[in-house]
Amino acid sequence: MVIAIIAILAAMLLPALASAKARAQRMQCMNQMRQLGLGFPIFVIDHNDMLPPAGWADGTYTQPHFAVTWDSLLNKYIGGNASDVDLSAGSYLSGDAPKILQCPADRFPKVSWMGGSDPYLAMRSYAMVSAGTSQGPTGDFQRDPKNGLPNLNLAGKLGVGIVWQVLAQYPVANFDASGYKSSVVRDPAGSILLCENTHGQQSAGNIWTSACFGPQSLGDIYQIDPSAAPQDPNSNNGVNQGALLYKAHKNRFNYVFNDGHVEGLKIEQTIGSGTLTAPKGMWTVVPGD
C-alpha cells in the first residue's frame, strides 16, 4: 500500500520536475547567451568599430588550422582559455572552448565533420545570423561598393554574420576576414545577432555551422511541429536536433539581439512580414520589415 502511494506521488511529481528542469535550462541558456552578447561590443571596441565575421576559411580544409569563427575571435572575451598562437592559427582544443557556448539543453550527440577522433570537437549551440557566404575569387554575393562587404539590401542577406569561404580550387583568392561596422545595424533592439542553432555537426570553430540562414537553419522549419521533423543526415543518431531543442525550450528559441538583450521567442514571432523560408522582421538589420 505504501509503495503504491509513493509510486502515485512520484508519477504526479515527475512532470512538474521535468518542467522545472526545462525552465532552468532555458534560463541558463539565456544567461549564457547574454554573456556571449557582451563579448561582441568589447571586440568592436578593440577592432575599430568592426564586428567579427561569422567565419573565414583559407581553402586548405585540413585539420587543424584552416578556419576561424566568431567564437574563436571572441574566445578571450567570453571565458575561453585558448592561446593566441592557437587562435591565430585557426583552431583550439576542446578544453579551451568557453563552456557557455553549449546550451545546457543541447546534450545531443555530435560528430566531427572532419571524421574520426577530433580533439578540436567542442560543443557550440549558437550561430550568428548570416549575411551571406563568399566562395572563390569573386564570391557568390554582391558586394556593396562602399565597403566591399555583402550588400545587406539584397534578398537573402539578413544579419551581420559574413562567412568568408575560399574553396580548395581557389587557394589564393581575394580573401579577407573583414566584418561590418556596427553602425550598419539600424535597428539594434529589433535585429537578431545570435540564435540557437544545433545539429549533428555544430561545434566550436566549425565554419560550416558558424552562421544561421533563418528559421530554416534551426533544424529546418519543423520546430513548430517537431513530430514532422525529418531525420538529420549530419547527426550520428539521425535525429533532427533543432526540433528537439525547440521542444525542450517549450516551443521557443533564445535569441541575442544587436543591442545585447536576450529574448525567448516562438519562431513565428521573429519573421515580421516575411515567411519561415524568407524571413524578415528580427532576422534583418532593416527596421520595420
Features from the language model and the residues they span:
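N-terminal single-pass transmembrane signal-anchor helix
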Residues: 1-21
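Short, well-structured segments within or immediately adjacent to enzyme catalytic domains
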Residues: 29-289
